[in-house]
């Protein structure tokens, strides 16, 4: 998958056009009949979304996702509470908007001209391309005229209008099925499971799903990069879109959108099939025996992140040893182990406890200006290449007019610490910054895979239990005597 990035020119153009369209309405947020007044009167902002690794999901019983975080900030900006409705498919989302059950659709939706006939698009906050996906091990199609199986796409998706345009323009025999009960992510799952041959999804969703289902692969792009946006009702009054424009401009100026982009998209761009398959196999075969230790000693960070750090260090091998003498699950040096009262570095529990304590210590040392949810990445870089070199990277970032408190800005300077023209400007000199960069990115990918894989397994288990419960209800159990003597169990006439 190609490297994901913000299309700033496209975002800027859409924002300017939207600003010009909304300019007359911006001053009157406080009107008695406008949408913003309705939202403030009821005290809640209603959004509809779908479950996906990017838009909305729960982790540790708390909501997360890029669209969720933006929507929560927008609700706070308006001074109201956020109400989230999760729908099973895209078609239901747009029904919510048409039926006035939602103020905004925040679900990673592509800017689409057909949708503008009924709905209004808001500002864009990242961009994607539409891609055809198939399963590794099957024949790779060269183009849409070369499909050897059935193409299935989600009802209500922008992919349908793209296919209609391509059919009219280039492939008149092109045909496809429309799924009314699955989201695009659900169809990606179906391709991974071998239940359907092909589907179309956006490049970001594919990159995220490959961390859980590495058997997914991209055949080719269907479109160029397109903006992703929120949708609202098409009303004469534009107060809601005007407020959204102001909000997104504020979030962009404050660096919030860039931080969310880094948090949710910054580590998605590269994909290693073999490494991902090996990691998922280790989750099944090795993690069950040591999971309780990560859960027990993960104090300041999520246990799955601690597990990802350990996998990057040792592949969960308690006897791992490097040529430099570091050992164990967390690959501690002798001096670090001594400072943490770890007497046996090859003891899994001692090593995990010590590594967790050391990581907590490193996070506490990170300068206070760094946002709470980014401190761990700075700490990991310091853990890998040394705290002093991490400070050098921050200073170099500031010298180059970047934000030293932003991981997105600092991480791209890490490789510069191994180049003389840059490290000669630093206090502590040469460092293997490219290794620290790769180290942190790998951990983030492992964490993403681990969280998604475990959630997917829980989802499948819940579906299985629900199916079994439905079966039991349809065919209730009977007493053994009644089963052996069915006639005697019947009521007398």
From Swiss-Prot:
Residues 22-268 are annotated as: Non-LT domain. Gene3D superfamilies: 1.10.530.10, Periplasmic binding protein-like II. Pfam families: SBP_bac_3, SLT. GO terms for biological process: cell wall macromolecule catabolic process; cell wall organization; peptidoglycan catabolic process. Residues 1-21 form the signal peptide. Residues 269-493 are annotated as: LT domain. InterPro entries: Lysozyme-like_dom_sf (IPR023346), MltF (IPR023703), Solute-binding_3/MltF_N (IPR001638), Transglyc_AS (IPR000189), Transglycosylase_SLT_dom_1 (IPR008258). It is found in: Cell outer membrane. SUPFAM superfamilies: Lysozyme-like, Periplasmic binding protein-like II. GO terms for molecular function: peptidoglycan lytic transglycosylase activity. The active site is at residue 313. Its EC number is 4.2.2.n1. It catalyses: Exolytic cleavage of the (1->4)-beta-glycosidic linkage between N-acetylmuramic acid (MurNAc) and N-acetylglucosamine (GlcNAc) residues in peptidoglycan, from either the reducing or the non-reducing ends of the peptidoglycan chains, with concomitant formation of a 1,6-anhydrobond in the MurNAc residue. It is a peripheral membrane protein. CDD domains: MLTF-like (cd13403), PBP2_YfhD_N (cd01009). NCBIfam families: PRK10859.1. PANTHER family: MEMBRANE-BOUND LYTIC MUREIN TRANSGLYCOSYLASE F. In the N-terminal section; belongs to the bacterial solute-binding protein 3 family. In the C-terminal section; belongs to the transglycosylase Slt family. Murein-degrading enzyme that degrades murein glycan strands and insoluble, high-molecular weight murein sacculi, with the concomitant formation of a 1,6-anhydromuramoyl product. Lytic transglycosylases (LTs) play an integral role in the metabolism of the peptidoglycan (PG) sacculus. Their lytic action creates space within the PG sacculus to allow for its expansion as well as for the insertion of various structures such as secretion systems and flagella. The N-terminal domain does not have lytic activity and probably modulates enzymatic activity. The C-terminal domain is the catalytic active domain. This is Membrane-bound lytic murein transglycosylase F. It comes from Erwinia tasmaniensis (strain DSM 17950 / CFBP 7177 / CIP 109463 / NCPPB 4357 / Et1/99). The gene is mltF.
């Amino acid at each position: 998958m190609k490297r994901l990035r913000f299309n700033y020119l496209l975002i800027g153009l859409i924002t300017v056009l939207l600003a010009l369209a909304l300019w007359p309405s911006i001053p009157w947020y406080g009107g008695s009949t406008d949408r913003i007044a309705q939202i403030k009167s009821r005290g809640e902002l209603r959004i509809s979304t779908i479950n996906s690794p990017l838009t909305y999901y729960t982790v540790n019983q708390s909501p997360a996702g890029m669209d969720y975080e933006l929507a929560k900030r927008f609700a706070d900006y308006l001074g109201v509470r956020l109400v989230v409705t999760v729908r099973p498919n895209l078609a239901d989302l747009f029904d919510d908007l048409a039926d006035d059950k939602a103020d905004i659709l925040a679900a990673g939706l592509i800017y689409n001209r057909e949708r503008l006939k009924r709905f209004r698009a808001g500002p864009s906050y990242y961009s994607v391309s539409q891609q055809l996906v198939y399963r590794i091990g099957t024949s790779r199609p060269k183009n849409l005229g070369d499909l050897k199986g059935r193409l299935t796409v989600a009802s209500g998706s922008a992919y349908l209008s793209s296919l209609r345009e391509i059919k009219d323009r280039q492939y008149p025999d092109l045909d496809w099925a429309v799924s009314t009960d699955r989201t695009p992510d659900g169809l990606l799952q179906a391709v991974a499971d071998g239940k359907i041959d092909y589907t179309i999804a956006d490049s970001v969703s594919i990159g995220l799903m490959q961390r859980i289902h590495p058997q997914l692969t991209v055949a080719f792009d269907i479109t160029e990069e397109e903006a992703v946006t929120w949708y609202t009702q098409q009303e004469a009054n534009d107060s809601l879109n005007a407020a959204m424009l102001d909000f997104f401009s504020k979030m962009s100026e404050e660096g919030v959108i860039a931080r969310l982009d880094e948090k949710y998209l910054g580590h998605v761009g590269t994909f290693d099939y073999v490494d991902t398959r090996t990691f998922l196999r280790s989750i099944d075969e090795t993690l069950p025996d040591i999971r309780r230790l990560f859960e027990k000693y993960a104090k300041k960070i999520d246990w799955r992140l601690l597990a990802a750090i350990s996998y990057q260090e040792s592949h969960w091998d308690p006897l791992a040893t490097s040529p430099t003498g570091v050992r164990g699950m967390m690959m501690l040096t002798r001096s670090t182990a001594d400072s943490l009262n770890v007497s046996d570095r090859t003891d899994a529990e001692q090593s995990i406890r010590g590594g967790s304590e050391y990581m907590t210590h490193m996070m506490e040392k990170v300068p206070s200006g760094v946002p709470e949810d980014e401190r761990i990445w700075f700490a990991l870089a310091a853990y890998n290449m040394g705290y002093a070199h991490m400070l050098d990277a921050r200073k170099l970032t500031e010298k180059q007019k970047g934000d030293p408190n932003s991981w997105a800005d600092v991480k791209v300077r890490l490789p510069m610490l191994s180049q003389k023209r840059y490290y000669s400007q630093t206090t502590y000199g040469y460092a293997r910054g490219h290794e620290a960069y790769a180290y942190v990115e790998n951990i983030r990918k492992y964490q993403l895979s681990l969280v998604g894989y475990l959630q997917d397994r829980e989802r499948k288990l819940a579906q299985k239990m629900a199916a079994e419960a439905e079966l039991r209800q349809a065919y209730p159990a009977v007493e053994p005597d009644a089963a052996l003597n069915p006639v005697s169990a019947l009521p007398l006439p």
